Amino acid sequence: MKNNWIDVLDESLVKDFYNNQTSEEQQEGLNTTLSFGTAGIRGKFGLGEGRLNKFTVSKVALGFAHYLTSSIAHPVVVIHYDTRHLSPEFAQIIANILASLDIKVYLADTYRTTPDLSFAVRYLQADAGVMITASHNPKDYNGIKVYGEDGAQLSTDDSARLSTYIDKLGHPLHINLPSLTTEQQSLIHSVPSEVREDYFKNVQDLVGTIPQSDLKVVFTSLHGTSVPVVPDILSSLNFNQFELVASQCEPDSDFSSVASANPEDHKAFDQSIELANLIDADLLIGTDPDADRLGIVERDAEGNIYYYNGNQIGALLLNYRIKQTEGLPNRIMFQSIVSGGLAKSLAQYHNVNFKEVLTGFKYIAAEIRHLSPEQNFIFGYEESYGFLARPFVRDKDAIQIVPLMIKYAAELKNEGRMLKDELEDITRNVGNFNDKLFSHTFEGTQGKAKIENIMTQFRSETPTEMCGLKVIAIEDFETGKKTDLQNDEVSDITLPKANVIKIYFNEGFIALRPSGTEPKIKLYVSLSCDHFDVIAQKINDAIFNS
C-alpha cells in the first residue's frame, strides 16, 4: 500500500511535508487512520490514511456530502478557512465535491475567522458549515471542523453519524469522486459582504461606546485571521489608540515569529511586550490563528508585566457582563467542567445561575440552544482561553471579546485602576483560586497507548488523599458516576459520558483528561490553599512520575 501512496505523491498536495518527515513519521501515516471525532478531524500533513492530504480530505468531503443529502433535500453549506498551509486548497476541494452532488456552497474568497464561520451559517440560514483550521497547533497540522445549522459544532451524535458516512467509503485511494460539471460549478458562491457587515453590527451593539481614555493597546494576530477584522471593528467603534505588532499581523503559514501561535503561551507575547514598552501601552491582546481564543497581558506605569490565565480572564469578563446586565432577570452563565472555581464563586456571589458542561464549546452552544425565553445568557467560557459574551455566534469568539475587554480596561483606566485591581477585588469578595494546567505530550501510536494507560491506572488507583488534601468526592465522566466519599454515596452524573476524571477536595479540585485535538493528556489543578505551586507540582509528579 505504501507504493500506491508514493505513486500519488505529486498530486497529494503534501509532497514537501512528506519528504521532510522522518521514516517513523512517514510510516505512522500509513499505519494509522484519521478519525472524525467530536471536534472534527485534526492531524499532520503527509501520506496515508492517518494524515491530511488531497485524498483523505476528499474522502471526508464526500462522506459529508452523503451525510447532508441523506436528510436534507437541497443543502446549503458555508466554507471558511484560516491562514494555514493548504487551508484554501482543502476548502476548494470540499466545495467542489459538495457542488458535484448538487449542494449549494458559500465559499470565502480569503481567510476568515472561526467566529465568522459560525455567524455566517446562522445569517445565511445554511444547513451546515465547514472551517478549515487547526487552531494553535504547529505549522504542519491542519483540520476540518463541521458546524450544524445553528452555527455550533456538531453534537456528539451527529458527529458519530457523519463518521459512519465517511468510514463506509473505504480507502481514500479507491474512491471514485464525482466530476464537477459547468452547471454545478455555478453552485459555488462567494460569501456576501453583508454577512460581515451584520456581524460588525452585532459586535457594536454588544460593546456600545468605548469611553475616551488614555488607554493604549497592543494587538497581535499571531499570523492568523484576526487582522484586518479586529482593527476594522475597533475603528468602527472610534477606538484608535492601538498598535499592531507588524511582524506578527501578516498571514504566515509557518508562524515564523513565534515558537507557538498560542495565546496561552507567555512567549507568544514577547514581541507585543517589546512594542508595549516602546509606546508605553497598558493592555496587550493576542488571538490564536483562527481567532476563536484570546489572551491578555497587562502593563503598569512602571513597566511591570502581568499575565492572566484563562480562568482569570473568564472571571474578569463575567464580572463585567454582570455589571452590564444589572437588573436583567434569570441571568445564566456556563463553563466547562475543567474550568476553575473563581467564576463559579463569582456567579453565586451575584445570584447568577451557573451550570457546568463537558469540555468543548459545542456543549455551551447546546445549552444556549435549549434556554427558555425567560432565561438570559450573559457569558460562557472555557479555561483554554475561549469566551462568548453574546450568542450571535455559537462558538468561542475572540473578535467580540477584544473590544469588550478594551472598553472594560478603558473604564478602569479612567478610574485610575487596572484589570489587576479589579481581579483583586473579585478574589477579596469571593475567595482566591489558584489554577495550573500541566500538559504532557505523547506523540504517535505509542504515545496514544501511554495516555490510555495513565487514564486507566488513575481510574483504578484513585486515592483518598493527595499531598495532604483529603478527597471528598470523585466524578468519573466515563462511567457517569459520582462517588461522595463523605457519605459513601454513588449518584449519576447528568452530563454525557466523556473520558474525564475529576477529584474534589474541600480546597478545590483536580481533573485529568486526554486532549481531543492534540496528542496530549492534561491535568487541571484549581485550589484555594497555601503553598499552591508546591502542592500542584507534587500532584502532577504523583500522577505522571509514579
Swiss-Prot record:
Reactions it catalyzes:
alpha-D-glucose 1-phosphate = alpha-D-glucose 6-phosphate
Protein name per the record: Phosphoglucomutase
Enzyme class, top EC level, equals: isomerase
Record keywords: Magnesium included?
A: yes
Q: Which residues form the active site?
A: 135 (phosphoserine intermediate)
Q: Which pathway is recorded for this entry?
A: Glycolipid metabolism; diglucosyl-diacylglycerol biosynthesis
* Binding-site residues, Mg(2+): 135, 288, 290, 292
Question: Which GO molecular function terms does the record list?
Answer: magnesium ion binding; phosphoglucomutase activity; phosphopentomutase activity
- Which keywords fit this entry according to its UniProt record? Carbohydrate metabolism, Glucose metabolism, Isomerase, Magnesium, Metal-binding, Phosphoprotein
A Gene Ontology BP annotation from the UniProt entry: enterobacterial common antigen biosynthetic process
Its cofactor is:
Mg(2+)
Q: Which domain of life is it from?
A: Bacteria
Family as reported in the entry's similarity comment: Belongs to the phosphohexose mutase family.
Which Pfam families is this protein grouped with? PGM_PMM_I (PF02878), PGM_PMM_II (PF02879), PGM_PMM_III (PF02880), PGM_PMM_IV (PF00408)
According to its UniProt entry, the function of this protein is described as: Catalyzes the interconversion between glucose-6-phosphate and alpha-glucose-1-phosphate. This is the first step in the biosynthesis of diglucosyl-diacylglycerol (Glc2-DAG), i.e. a glycolipid found in the membrane, which is also used as a membrane anchor for lipoteichoic acid (LTA).
Q: What InterPro entries does its record include?
A: A-D-PHexomutase_a/b/a-I, A-D-PHexomutase_a/b/a-I/II/III, A-D-PHexomutase_a/b/a-II, A-D-PHexomutase_a/b/a-III, A-D-PHexomutase_C, A-D-PHexomutase_C_sf, A-D-PHexomutase_CS, Alpha-D-phosphohexomutase_SF
Enzyme Commission number(s) from the entry: 5.4.2.2
- Cofactor note, please? Binds 1 Mg(2+) ion per subunit.
